[in-house]
């Protein structure tokens, strides 16, 4: 049984839309938008970021984790 309705709207890259060219690993509030409640990096298909910025985002999140600005894992109880 196929579900009908409106076609899905294409997600827009947050960084392209806001003209952000540099993703700083010290900007924790921005990075938290792209991390799940468990602490995992959200995939492109969920966030809508372009491939270029997803790569930059991944590097920034990993750097922030290494200097203890972000946790590797969030314990949700």
From Swiss-Prot:
GO terms for biological process: translation. This is Small ribosomal subunit protein bS18. Keywords: Ribonucleoprotein, Ribosomal protein, RNA-binding, rRNA-binding. Binds as a heterodimer with protein bS6 to the central domain of the 16S rRNA, where it helps stabilize the platform of the 30S subunit. It holds the Pfam family Ribosomal_S18. It comes from the Bacteria. GO terms for molecular function: small ribosomal subunit rRNA binding; structural constituent of ribosome. Belongs to the bacterial ribosomal protein bS18 family. One of its GO terms (cellular component) is cytosolic small ribosomal subunit. Part of the 30S ribosomal subunit. Forms a tight heterodimer with protein bS6. InterPro entries: Ribosomal_bS18, Ribosomal_bS18_CS, Ribosomal_bS18_sf. HAMAP family: Ribosomal_bS18 (MF_00270).
């Amino acid at each position: 049984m196929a579900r009908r309705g409106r076609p899905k709207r294409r997600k827009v890259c947050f960084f392209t839309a806001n003209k952000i060219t540099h993703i700083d690993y010290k900007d924790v509030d921005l990075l938290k938008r792209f991390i799940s409640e468990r602490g995992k990096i959200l995939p492109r298909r969920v966030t809508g970021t372009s491939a270029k910025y997803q790569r930059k985002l991944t590097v920034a999140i990993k750097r922030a984790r290494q200097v203890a600005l972000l946790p590797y894992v969030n314990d949700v109880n």
